[in-house]
Regions:
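Sec-dependent N-terminal signal peptides
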Residues: 3-12
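Extracytoplasmic
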Residues: 17-268, 278-283, 287-427
């Protein structure tokens, strides 16, 4: 009996860990262009032999794996799976899902591991369907991070990637009326889906986005005090009102992640250039607050009004000054983005400017839950920075403070009285 137990333990010791990685939350089409092949059932289905679908998983140390694919194809197909400088071909046939052994791979270091999946041969309309990548390892200390399930719609949020934030330390016991900041996006760090948010506050946000290969927006939004994701459900008394907007700016209601007033300008902002953002917060005696934002190319020394909104049931000065970086396109969650957030200042109601030199780096539930580990932020070369996506290795822990050196010479010089007032919309 003792010999039997010994042999049993010996035979199973190579299977100390097994992980099932669902493709629905961890896979991107990476060639010939970013996209998705995941169907509504959460399975990868594709027919183009030129496509490559990449699966990502994070390891905390070097490891050796036995690899398998869980899939099905009613007609004979041949798949190719490449990872860690090794490549395998897998023959598959069968209408029901089953596990197809791939082979053994050895990974030399910790970090993100990518598996590139493609189709070599098909006899039907497509290369079948694949639901999971299965990894087995004899290392019982090994930890893997990936999107494990769709709980909380995490297949969607996980494929978007982690969002990161910088919360700025502003002077206490001061009524802050103005917030100023600058963003520079380095060349090549602005994939589709990027939102570089510059001036965030307790009731809204202001920044710029990459909407498509040919379209970019400057976006300024203010939430209604009425909590809903359906803007049509907001009572008249709780609606955000557009007071003015700049030339070519579109103002409308929005929903989905809270609801309220939204304005945007289609503007061809460029990576490698520095842009500046200015937001004014004016509380009124009738328990409303007016939020107004301007945008401009720093080098051109220009300002243009984006919009001015009035928010009901609100009487506050600037609160919660922050910036963030997010990706809003699930098909571009494997692309890295980087923003340099610099020269933050606030101006109080007495007209005194205060420089911001401290910021707290935080992250969303996708990062905090360990679903994605490709996030970073901090201070470097005199500015704050944030980075996410792309499955990079140099992660920075969230919930820590960073400082940048003071530079009083960069204090904004703004003629507040002569800022563009735009086109009145309503009273």
């Amino acid at each position: 009996m003792k010999l039997f137990l010994f042999l049993l333990l010996t035979a199973t010791s190579g299977l100390a860990g097994e992980w099932t990685i669902p493709l629905a939350g961890n896979t991107y089409r990476t060639a010939p262009a970013p996209g998705s092949g995941i169907n509504r059932a959460g399975k990868l289905v594709w027919s183009n032999p030129e496509e490559v679908h990449s699966i990502y998983v994070h390891l905390d140390q070097a490891a050796t794996f036995d690899v398998a694919l869980r899939g099905a194809s009613p007609t004979p197909v041949r798949w190719k799976l490449a990872s860690a400088n090794q490549s395998f071909e897998i023959e598959a046939e069968g209408a029901d899902l089953k596990d197809y052994p791939v082979g053994k791979i050895k990974v030399a270091k910790a970090g993100y591991l990518k598996f590139d999946l493609s189709g070599l041969k098909k006899t039907g309309a497509n290369f079948g369907e694949i639901s999971d990548l299965i990894l087995q390892s004899g290392n019982d200390d090994l930890k893997l991070h990936f999107v494990k399930s769709n709980k909380g719609n995490m297949f969607y949020w996980g494929r978007r990637g982690p969002s990161v934030h910088l919360g700025y330390q502003v002077p206490k016991r001061k009524n802050i009326e103005w917030a100023y900041s600058e963003i520079t996006v380095p060349k090549g760090e602005d994939p589709i889906g990027s939102y570089f948010m510059a001036n965030g506050f307790g009731q809204g946000y202001f920044g710029f986005q990459v909407k498509s290969p040919t379209e970019r927006w400057v976006l300024f939004s203010v939430w209604s005090p009425f909590k809903t994701n359906n803007p049509n459900a907001i009572p008249e008394k709780d609606r955000v009102t557009t007071l003015a907007k700049g030339r070519d700016v579109r103002a409308q209601k929005f929903g989905g992640e809270g609801s309220g007033g939204q304005s945007f300008l289609k503007y061809p902002w460029q990576s490698g250039k520095t842009y500046r953002f200015l937001t004014r917060v004016q509380p009124n005696d009738d328990d409303t607050t007016v939020y107004t934002s301007w945008f401009g190319d720093k080098e051109a020394n220009e300002w243009q009004l984006i919009a001015s909104f009035r928010r009901p049931r609100t009487k506050v000065h600037l609160t919660g000054f922050h910036s963030f970086l997010e990706n809003f396109s699930v098909n571009f969650g494997a692309e890295k983005r980087l923003g340099l957030y610099g020269n933050q200042w606030v101006c109080d109601t007495d007209g005194t400017w205060h420089e911001i030199t401290r910021a707290r780096f935080t992250a969303d539930a996708t990062a905090r839950g360990g679903h994605r580990l490709d996030y970073a932020g901090g201070s470097k070369d005199g500015v704050f920075f944030m980075k996410n996506g792309g499955f990079f290795a140099d992660r920075v822990e969230f919930d820590q403070w960073f400082e940048k050196p003071s530079n009083p010479e960069t204090k904004p010089t703004i003629d507040f009285k002569n800022l563009p007032k735009g086109e009145p919309v309503s009273k």
